[in-house]
Amino acid sequence: MSKLAQKSGLVWLWLSLLLLVVDFASKTLVVSSMAYQESINLLPVFSITYVHNYGAAYSFLSDAGGWQRWFLSAIAIAISGLLVWWLKRLPATNKVLCAAYSLVLAGAIGNLYDRIAYGYVIDFIHVFYKNSHFPVFNVADCAICIGAALLLFDAFTGESPKEHKA
């Protein structure tokens, strides 16, 4: 690894890779062991439910006719490029922002892979209480949400991001 990568936030790409492996492995396990729309209750408020999401969060645009696959893929590619660029400019010591960008990057790439390979995103984590159901999601979605929460945390508590000069 180059000296620049050792000093920049790019060293945090290990976190993205780890989350990508967990996301891919969990989706592979669900697809290989469950039928589409099958649900396995694990707790009174939690089940594994295999579904396809053709849209974005909360199935937004899922009935848009197919163009959304490429539109959402283009957005994910652009955001991923931007996140890598930001990581390159951040010092590796800026742990909160580096972790946040790496988590969002992992989620974007994890869902991008599904969208390009299959035309939909594989979701399976189902949380509910009585008749109230949260939309089914996946590990990539968790990474994006945790990354976004870290970005908010940093916005309220962190210092201004300092650019790394090579």
Swiss-Prot record:
PROSITE patterns: SPASE_II. The chain crosses the membrane at residues 11-31, 42-62, 67-87, 90-110, 133-153. One of its GO terms (cellular component) is plasma membrane. Pathway: Protein modification; lipoprotein biosynthesis (signal peptide cleavage). The keyword Mitochondrion does not apply. The keyword Protease applies. GO terms for molecular function: aspartic-type endopeptidase activity. It is found in: Cell inner membrane. InterPro entries: Peptidase_A8. Its EC number is 3.4.23.36. One of its GO terms (biological process) is proteolysis. It catalyses: Release of signal peptides from bacterial membrane prolipoproteins. Hydrolyzes -Xaa-Yaa-Zaa-|-(S,diacylglyceryl)Cys-, in which Xaa is hydrophobic (preferably Leu), and Yaa (Ala or Ser) and Zaa (Gly or Ala) have small, neutral side chains. It is an enzyme of class 3 (hydrolase). It is a multi-pass membrane protein. Keywords: Aspartyl protease, Cell inner membrane, Cell membrane, Hydrolase, Membrane, Protease, Transmembrane, Transmembrane helix. The active site is at D123, D141. This protein specifically catalyzes the removal of signal peptides from prolipoproteins. Belongs to the peptidase A8 family. This is Lipoprotein signal peptidase.
